[in-house]
Regions:
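Membrane-interface interhelical connector segments
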Residues: 104-116
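Short helix-capping/hinge motifs at transmembrane helix termini and TM-loop junctions
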Residues: 31, 107, 170-173
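Membrane-interface extramembranous regions at the lipid-water interface
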Residues: 1-35, 39-97, 126-164, 180-203
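Membrane-helix interfacial "entry" motifs
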Residues: 37-40, 44, 116, 120, ...
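Membrane-anchoring/interfacial helices and their immediately flanking loops
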Residues: 93-107
């Protein structure tokens, strides 16, 4: 019998994957000194809305993935790590949102640069923390005997590579793009969860 939770979670993961490239592009535009203050604020607000929507959809899908592992396969090995990622990403989105809007309101100049730097440091630290935990999650998932129709391992690999990109900081945009593939694989796992029965060898 089809579980609507997994179907909804799949579409949320797809939504997050679709919004992520647009958010990345708008974030670059918002960081560029183009146009007047109102234009900068408009771009920043648009990036904020799309970025927040992508993050919310992605986090809900991640919560459902944890539920899928818990309920269908009795696996709880990444529960605490997923909780950490959810909390940290929520804080990161909030800090980035406040910083982006404040910088846009200030406009172009030394004050804007100083303000941006004040927000960049915590954002980088939070990104590194998320990257490290993503690597650990990926490694744990790679150790599972059951591959959930050959999708766990690709998801784990994307998690490790994207996490490494965030840890390296300079490759963070690449890591963000890899989240698109990660969410697509996650969506496929949700869709296929309704097509198969739990497998007892999942440990």
């Amino acid at each position: 019998m089809e579980d609507e939770r997994w179907t909804r979670a799949a579409w949320m993961a797809i939504g997050a994957a679709a919004l992520t490239p647009a958010n990345l592009l708008l974030s670059f535009l918002a960081d560029m000194p183009i146009g007047t203050a109102p234009v900068g604020v408009m771009i920043a607000v648009t990036a904020l809305i799309i970025g927040t929507a992508a993050a919310v959809l992605s986090l809900i899908a991640l919560c459902r993935f944890r539920e899928l592992l818990n309920e269908r396969y009795g696996y709880h090995g990444i529960d605490a790590l997923v909780t950490f990622v959810i909390v940290t990403i929520s804080v990161l989105v909030a800090v980035a949102a406040v910083g982006r809007v404040m910088v846009a309101l200030v406009g172009i100049g030394d004050q804007a640069v100083r303000l941006a730097l004040a927000f960049v440091v915590p954002i980088i630290l939070l990104g590194i923390a998320i990257g490290i935990v993503s690597i650990i999650v990926g490694i744990k998932l790679l150790s599972l005997e059951n591959d959930l129709q050959h999708l766990i391992r690709p998801y784990a690999v994307f998690s490790i590579i994207s996490g490494a990109c965030f840890v390296l900081v300079i490759l963070a945009p690449v890591g963000t793009l890899l989240l698109v593939a990660e969410n697509v694989v996650l969506a496929l796992m949700f869709f296929r969860a309704n097509e198969s029965d739990p497998m007892v060898e999942f440990v």
